């Protein structure tokens, strides 16, 4: 498994992050098999959130991993906080309480990475800064980042927060690629030219934030998986063609498409199927050509100006 430096930090992480949002759909035996398959593949970066399964996913993960100090040393744990029923909450009290809850459920005394999950309209950045300081000084969190945030929101936090922000988790896939396509539609009058995220892709590259694409196989906002979908026949044909060339699965090609981007992204898997997880990890070994990358992008209905 190839690795990258997370943001501007010295933390080496695998290029594939293992998402644990659906871990509560597995029984104990399957959860154990899933976690240990990931570790065997070199995908030791596990991605959580306090709300996944109402907290159960973190508990299931710790039990499945057989969490101990020696096991903990073999993995990198990231969790997110800031979502409550009916609201978002970046208050100092909520951030601190959320981290304590995650640590208890994960049976560990520290998180390698903490992300703020979704932008809080009532954010008081001074409170975020105070929470981050306490978490860093206590050793409970080693690195910090954000999720689903645009450049101005990040700049507001950076004005007050002392710690470097190392990651931004964003929805991105072949069929949800406005973050990419708006860049080459500059100065055009078509809908693809609409900048919906403040230029977050280039911002993250300029400011050393690793982009972690979530839902890399989805179209729309959890609209469904595009692989095998009759909504994307041309895309599926092209992906299958490239997969055959490299002797890999369609799943591998989808992840390789994201890894081909020079922003050095870290896609987050969502599957609970060990076979598909292995296919995702194989993308680390596949380097698409420029021609293949663009052909896949265009086959999804994206158009060059």
Task: Report the location of each language-model feature.
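Active-site groove signature of glycoside hydrolases
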Residues: 103-124
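Beta/alpha (TIM)-barrel catalytic core signal, keyed to glycine-rich beta->alpha loops juxtaposed to Asp/Glu
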Residues: 125-305
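Conserved beta-strand positions
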Residues: 18, 48, 79, 113-116, ...
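Structural motif corresponding to the early beta-alpha repeats
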Residues: 71-93, 117-118
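Short, acidic/polar
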Residues: 26-38, 90-105, 152-155
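Acidic-and-aromatic substrate-binding clefts and catalytic sites of carbohydrate-active enzymes
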Residues: 23-29, 49-59, 84-89, 120-124, ...
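A structural motif
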Residues: 43, 108-111, 141, 165
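N-terminal binding-site loop/beta-alpha segment at the start of enzyme catalytic domains
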Residues: 1-75, 137, 219-220
């Amino acid at each position: 498994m190839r690795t990258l430096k997370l943001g501007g930090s010295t933390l080496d992480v695998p290029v594939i992050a293992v998402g644990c949002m659906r871990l509560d759909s597995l029984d104990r035996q399957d959860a154990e098999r899933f976690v240990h398959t990931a570790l065997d593949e070199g995908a030791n970066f596990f991605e959580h959130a306090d709300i996944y399964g109402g907290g159960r996913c973190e508990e299931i993960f710790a039990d499945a991993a057989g969490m101990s100090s020696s096991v903990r040393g073999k993995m990198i744990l990231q969790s997110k906080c800031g979502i409550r029923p009916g609201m978002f909450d970046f208050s100092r009290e909520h951030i601190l309480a959320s981290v304590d809850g995650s640590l208890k459920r994960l049976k560990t005394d520290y998180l390698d990475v903490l992300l703020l999950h979704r932008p809080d309209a009532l954010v008081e950045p001074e409170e975020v800064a105070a929470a981050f300081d306490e978490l860093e000084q206590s050793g409970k969190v080693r690195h910090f980042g954000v999720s689903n945030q645009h450049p101005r929101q990040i700049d507001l936090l950076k004005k007050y927060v002392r710690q470097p922000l190392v990651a931004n988790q964003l929805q991105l896939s072949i069929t949800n690629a406005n973050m990419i396509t708006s860049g080459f539609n500059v100065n055009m009058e078509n809908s693809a030219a609409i900048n919906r995220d403040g230029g977050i892709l280039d911002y993250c590259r300029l400011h050393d934030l690793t982009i972690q694409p979530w839902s890399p196989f989805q179209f729309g906002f959890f609209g469904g998986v595009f692989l095998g979908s009759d909504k994307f026949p041309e895309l599926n044909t092209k992906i299958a063609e490239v997969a055959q060339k490299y002797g890999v699965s369609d799943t591998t090609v989808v992840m390789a498409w994201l890894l081909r981007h020079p922003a050095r992204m870290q896609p987050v898997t969502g599957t609970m199927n060990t076979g598909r997880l292995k296919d995702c990890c194989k993308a680390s070994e596949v380097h698409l050509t420029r021609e293949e990358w663009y052909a896949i992008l265009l086959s999804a209905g994206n158009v060059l100006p």
